[in-house]
From Swiss-Prot:
SS bond partners: C85-C96, C107-C124
Residues spanning the signal sequence: 1-29
Primary subcellular site in the record, as a coarse category: secreted
Name of the protein in question: Prophenin-2
Molecular functions (GO terms): lipopolysaccharide binding
Cross-referenced Pfam families: Cathelicidins
Organism of this sequence: Sus scrofa (Pig)
Amino acid sequence: METQRASLCLGRWSLWLLLLALVVPSASAQALSYREAVLRAVDRLNEQSSEANLYRLLELDQPPKADEDPGTPKPVSFTVKETVCPRPTRRPPELCDFKENGRVKQCVGTVTLDQIKDPLDITCNEGVRRFPWWWPFLRRPRLRRQAFPPPNVPGPRFPPPNVPGPRFPPPNFPGPRFPPPNFPGPRFPPPNFPGPPFPPPIFPGPWFPPPPPFRPPPFGPPRFPGRR
């Protein structure tokens, strides 16, 4: 009787150990690595995206401290870049080449390492400066600088320069000497034009009236004193 009970207990313990051995590998198989969880989040982002091309993981920040619970949300920060593969092709992004001058997005959020839970709690922005997940813990408070009034110091006053200007002697250059012109004057032949055939002028002389006859004045003979 005791032998049957012992065998029954041993069978129960064997069954429990067998079930435990089956459950532990299945649980470990459901857990993802940090990079696999991020890649799954990138796939979900491509599924929900309305853009023409797929995005591929470009850079992944350092993972946080390891946590035994795969269902605990873990902070994540990574960068994705646009590829040359169109989104309707459903091609794995890891097999696509990056597009030259493609768009780059910075993504932050949380992911879980459990395959069953939905890991998508990611926000992506374009043109945002990238910071690691531990950056808020290392930030130091900025010290405000004390505002001082601007200095009210008058500037230096310099007297105007009293430097005499240069004195140059007057130019003593002789003027140019040109020889007198020795050009022969023009030689014209004497004019040989016939004069106009005018008749000699006949002008009447001036007409004066004849003088009146001379009449002596009516005086007597002259008388001289001293003579009788």
